[in-house]
């Protein structure tokens, strides 16, 4: 065989391999946005009025004030949601009461009857129970109303674990919380050790990027603090629109919101007591940026919520035949075995490859008879769409339902996708209280910032680092920490440091406040 003929065969082999990798999916860019603390019924339940196929609400749903009292007064689910303050209960024990009505977790399916009772235990005035038993009219969340009508809504997507924010956020990109059932400040700040979809993508030379605003919560994964990933972090305000316009968004793009609620830059994460209006503006901006990008016809946008935030949902959460991701048992006193899911959350998929008005129910017994859609479905679907050869991250993403099928119905991308979405409706009266003390989630972000900056060595960690800090102070602190963290990483790389090492800041080079 001649050298020329051999070279031709080699070229054909490479072409065939490339086509094999990409032929099954038109999607080359996956964009993930994880919002905060709202249930499906609370945000999207009333969309059933627009499309009866959606498993939403009709107003007949209710919860008793006292589960154990057969004659207890019941509160019906309404459509009067607006600005919510304070934040309803969503700890592990609070969710157990909301789902089962008591500490007895043996009922299958669970009755989902303890939301009002649990809210009354936190607020006997009844204000909180009224909040958790109300949802938004579609016109109050017009951006979602449009996306649900134009693209796909999942009406059976659950949080991965019946717990709070960070354990569920961990599942989104790694299929496990590494045993966490609560927002443990020390573990979060030190970083969780599990392998992530980012690592798998990097190993197979797929690009990824994180577009952050205050500080990226994905840095709770320890591996993302490695020097080799320093250039994966981009300022949302400075880079996202430019990268999208230039067609340079990474294959796996994560967009993080503003978590700090300030006068000039209100929070956009939907976490109570933040204004849903700002969250709608944020989603509108992300969509319209992607829609105008030359990458649009190869893009999938996934919008989900980390957990339900204490709000009512009528669909029983799966409590049987859910596999533990890695065999790790949660800490005392609950010793949770990660064998049931959390409460249903809003999830929307957007792409020109999705038919209008698509409603996605369960995964129909695939890949396992008990499989469900939950946050681990994201890395599982990424693996399929990008044909990754690496093993599943855990038993959970191996089990989770995947949704590549909704992108495989059409032979060509749609050309009628709206270029703009409706203007959101202002909900909160008044302005952000930037002088308020930090919430639990915001404290965790400040504690993360302290580790990135090296300040955790300056005081008793972790409680003291954010003690007495206001929202505006916390915002400035974490943004300064992120700036210094990235600068230190770039400098270390320029000096020839090992790219597999973590970025380490020296306390002597930083101060507690910027």
UniProtKB/Swiss-Prot annotation:
It is an enzyme of class 3 (hydrolase). Expressed in leaves, stems, flowers and siliques. It is found in: Secreted. Keywords: Hydrolase, Secreted, Signal. One of its GO terms (cellular component) is chloroplast. The keyword Ribonucleoprotein does not apply. The keyword Lipid metabolism does not apply. Induction: Not induced by inorganic phosphate deprivation. Residues 1-23 form the signal peptide. One of its GO terms (biological process) is defense response to bacterium. This is Non-specific phospholipase C2.
